[in-house]
Structures are given as C-alpha cells and as structure tokens.
From Swiss-Prot:
GO terms for biological process: amino acid metabolic process; pyridoxal phosphate biosynthetic process; pyridoxine biosynthetic process. It is an enzyme of class 4 (lyase). This is Pyridoxal 5'-phosphate synthase subunit PdxS. The active site is at K101 (schiff-base intermediate with d-ribose 5-phosphate). Catalyzes the formation of pyridoxal 5'-phosphate from ribose 5-phosphate (RBP), glyceraldehyde 3-phosphate (G3P) and ammonia. The ammonia is provided by the PdxT subunit. Can also use ribulose 5-phosphate and dihydroxyacetone phosphate as substrates, resulting from enzyme-catalyzed isomerization of RBP and G3P, respectively. Its EC number is 4.3.3.6. It comes from Sulfurisphaera tokodaii (strain DSM 16993 / JCM 10545 / NBRC 100140 / 7) (Sulfolobus tokodaii). In the presence of PdxT, forms a dodecamer of heterodimers. The lineage of its organism: Archaea, Thermoproteota, Thermoprotei, Sulfolobales, Sulfolobaceae.
Length: 316
C-alpha cells in the first residue's frame, strides 16, 4: 500500500507521517482505499434490493442515500443523510464497500456514519447544505471522504480539507452528462495551464485557489490531481461512462441513471462493462446494445433549470 501512495506522489503533501504502521484511519489507508476503486463503478442505491443488483452487476461499491438525485430534485424540501438502519441493512447484505452521503458542513452526520462503519463518506451537494460557507474538516476523521468539484480550485480546496477522492459534480439527477463533461474538461485544462506557468504565476494561483503552494506544485509534478478523480453527475448510459473515462476519469459514479431507468439490472451490468473496457469501442458497442434507449431515465435539459435549481453551485 505504501508503494501505491508513493506512486501517487502524496508523500510530499499529506500532513501525517506515512512511514508508520498501516492503521485504520491513517492518512495512508484513507488515500489508498479510493485508489482500489479505480476503473470501477459506484452506484447510488436506496435499499437492499438495489444494492444487491449493483453488487451482482459488478459495481466496486454502492452509495446509500435516502432518495436518488432525480427524486431529491423532484421532491424539494430538505434532503438529509439516509436512515442509518437502511445503511446498516445494506452493509449486512452485500460484500462490496458501502459509502453514504452527508450534507455539506454537517460534521455530526459524518460522525454518525463513521460510528456506523461505512467505508467512505460523500460530503455531497445533492443533499441540502448544513453550512453554506464551510465544508467539514475531513482530517479529523478515520473514514475517507469524497467531494465534488467543478474546477481545479474547488478540487484542491477539498483535498486540502482532507478529501481522499474527488468527483466531478456534473448536474446530478438530470440524466444529462454535459455538465460532467464540462467539469472534467475544466479541471484537466486548468492542470495543463498550471504546468505551463512560471513559479511566480503558480504562487498567484495558489493564493487565488486559497490552498497551500505545495499542493499546486504536487499537482504540477503529477500532471493530474493528487487523489483519484471519478466522474459523476448525469451519467445514464454505457456510452456516457465510456466518454467520461476517455476524458480522463479514474472511474464512474452513477446516480439516478440506473435505478430511474426501466432496465436497471441490465443497465447496471452494461455500464460496468463499458467502464472497464472503455478503450475498446467494440465492447462499448456491445454494452450499449444491452440497453434500450426507450427504457432510459427521462432526462432534464440543463438549460431549462433555474439558477436556484442547480445543485452543482452548492459548496464552492
């Protein structure tokens, strides 16, 4: 595991010493767990039945929440973390890792999930933020966190706060991959810009991003984010998943795209197949043929959303 962390270049930035024993909750373990998810698909689920479908389809993990993002968007009101009893039932029914979402800034929802024993916490803009100004200080926790980002500044701020994994925000619950594409391209484009900058300009960028200069330098050295970066937000088909992998994602989160479709069992398997074999168009074609477009979730045009309906703007 130490070799994996060294390969990621994290030794020069992370605050804890990584030459110690491997202990649960250590920085090394928290940053290694997401690395083992690379190339896989994490699926949103709301109950045991969906979790079992996800596991059977080959998902590397599930994300438990009270409502799928599409339903969160439609129902309105305050979206909170899932019922701990449901999360526990899912944990007891499957063998793959179980993640769960908390509201941005809600320290105690995160503490509850840590006590419950989830494998990872998503501090998510899909839920109603508890703190409009600040995210959770994730260094205090033994469990690893994933956070969303639309650009490099957001990504590096979340990593500085202790996030072990980043995902594009996209626009969750829409079945529209366009925002995930945009966010992935922005992050990768801003990394390329950093690489071409002088040291003085990089220091200015660090101040602009409100992050330590060391993490900017580490990003330049690696030529990528210092942690795993998955794609999320609007992924609904095998082709969507393959596209995001082609754009540089390390893996895929699928929210409403599977269980708001009319063919969740086969769609889950098809998305896993396309993600694992994104470099082979013939296999992606096979995956796409497994599903029927007529059974896909009803998508939402991003342009039809009012500014206050956008989830991605939460937590900058």
């Amino acid at each position: 595991m130490r070799d994996i962390i060294k390969d990621q270049g994290l030794l020069s930035f992370l605050p804890q010493k990584l030459d110690a024993e491997l202990v649960q909750g250590s920085t090394m373990v928290k940053h290694a767990f997401p690395i083992f998810q690379k190339g896989g698909v994490v699926m949103d689920v709301t109950n045991v039945t969906q979790a079992e479908i996800a596991e059977d389809a080959g998902a590397t993990a599930v994300m438990v929440l009270d409502k799928l993002p599409y339903d969160v968007r439609k129902s309105g009101g305050v979206a909170r973390m899932a019922d701990p009893k449901i999360i526990e039932e899912v944990m007891n029914s499957i063998t793959i890792p179980v993640m769960a979402k908390v509201r941005i800034g809600h320290y105690y929802e995160a503490k509850i999930l840590e006590a419950l024993g989830v494998d990872m916490i998503d501090e998510s803009e899909v839920l109603t933020p508890a703190d409009e100004e600040h995210h959770i200080n994730k260094w205090e926790f033994k469990v690893p966190f994933v956070n969303g980002a639309r650009n490099l500044g957001e990504a590096l701020r979340r990593i500085t706060e202790g996030a072990s994994m980043i995902r594009t925000k996209g626009e969750a619950g829409t079945g529209n991959v366009s925002e995930a594409v945009k966010h992935m391209k922005i992050i990768n484009g801003e990394i390329r810009s950093l690489i071409s900058m002088s040291e003085e300009d990089r220091m200015k960028k660090a101040r602009e991003y409100q992050v330590p200069y060391q993490i900017v330098e580490l990003t330049v050295k690696l030529g990528r984010l210092p942690v795993v970066n998955f794609a999320a937000g609007g992924i609904a088909t095998p082709a969507d998943a393959a596209l995001m992998m082609w754009l540089g994602a390390d893996g895929i989160f699928v929210g409403s795209g599977i269980f708001k479709s009319q063919d969740p069992d086969v769609r889950a398997k098809a998305i896993v197949l396309a993600t694992a074999n994104w470099e082979d168009p013939e296999i992606v074609l096979e995956a796409q043929k497994m599903i029927s477009e007529s059974k896909s979730m009803m998508g939402i045009d991003i342009k039809a959303l009012k500014p206050e309906e956008l989830l991605q703007v939460r937590g900058q």
